[in-house]
C-alpha cells in the first residue's frame, strides 16, 4: 500500500485576531518591537519568554523564544523570521517559522510538531489608533494547514494577547 501521509495541502487557512487594547498605539508598538517588552508577554498562558532579539528594519531578523512550563517539559521553542514591511506605529509584516536558538529554520517535525505544521507563515500586524489612548490590534497569520495545530494556534494567540493586554495595564 502506498504511503498515505499527505505531503501537499491545497487549502490553506488564515487566522485573524482583533483586539481593542487599553493603551496608546506607541505603547502597543513598543510591546511588539522592544525585546525586553516582548519577553513579558510572548507565548501562551503559563509559558515564559527567556530570550528575544529584534533587528527592526525591512530585511531585519527577529528571534522569539517561548519556554513551556515545567509540567509540560520546560523545553524552549524558537520562532524566527524576517521583517518584510514596516510602517512605524501602523503595520508590521514578517515571515515566521520554527528555528533553532540562532534563528536558523528547522523542520517543525524535528521538534515533535505534526508533519503538516507550516514551515513558514506570513504575519501582518496592524495597529490602529482609536480614541486618544486605545489601540485596535489586528493580527493576521496566513498559510496555516487545517488541523489540530491550527486550532491550538488560535487559542495560543488569544492567550498571548491576553498576556499583552495585562502587561499594558502596568
Which functions belong to the PLM regions below?
Residues 34-35, 62-66, 105-112:
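Short Pro/Gly-enriched beta-strand edge/turn motifs at strand-loop
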Residues 3-6, 69-71, 108-115:
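Short, P/G- and charge-enriched loop/turn segments at secondary-structure junctions
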Residues 19, 51-54, 79-85, 120-129:
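Hydrophobic/aromatic beta-strand elements that line small-molecule binding cavities or substrate pockets
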Residues 93-96, 103-158:
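Beta-strand/loop substructures that line and gate deep hydrophobic ligand-binding cavities in soluble
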Residues 28, 38, 62, 83, ...:
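Hydrophobic pocket/interface hotspot
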